[in-house]
Amino acid sequence: MLKKKVNNDAGKTFILISSSCSSCQKAIEYFKENNLSYTIENFYKKPISDKRFRDILSLSEDGTESLFSKRADQIRSNTNQSVEDLTIPELIKLIRERPSILRRPIIIQYNSSGIPKRMRIGYNAAEIKVFERSLMEPKVRTVKK
């Protein structure tokens, strides 16, 4: 009998932060004020996992473009390498070495099956309200024979 793998992200919202980030503090305050559940992940203290980074990429509408701050441009000018040219393992390594290149906060929400469904990067008072709405789960129809 196969054991079903438990997904620890199921139904959760994660706020990826750095401690000194004022936008991160605004996002946390918003979640507190609206009684929304969340888990904080400080990626300066504990690096972003490969899985979490891949989940973030899966929800990014423009690849890596919106993920990186202006500091990423400094990396481009110091090396002849563009962030867009890096492989995913190279990006993860770079982020672990220089977490300040990521925009913050990154808020990612998973459905009850543990599939990443929503993400916002940075703090925007209007856009963050999307996390107040529940995720719509697909309804399973039974077919009568």
Curated annotation (Swiss-Prot):
Name the record gives this protein: Uncharacterized protein MG127 homolog
PANTHER family assigned to the protein according to its UniProt record, in alphabetical order: ARSENATE REDUCTASE, GLOBAL TRANSCRIPTIONAL REGULATOR SPX
UniProtKB keywords: Disulfide bond, Oxidoreductase, Redox-active center
Disulfide bond annotation, renumbered to this chain: C21-C24
Pfam families, alphabetized: ArsC
InterPro entries: Arsenate_reductase-like, Thioredoxin-like_sf, Tscrpt_reg_Spx/MgsR
Homology family: Belongs to the ArsC family.
A single GO molecular function term of this UniProt record: oxidoreductase activity
Source organism per UniProt: Mycoplasma pneumoniae (strain ATCC 29342 / M129 / Subtype 1) (Mycoplasmoides pneumoniae)
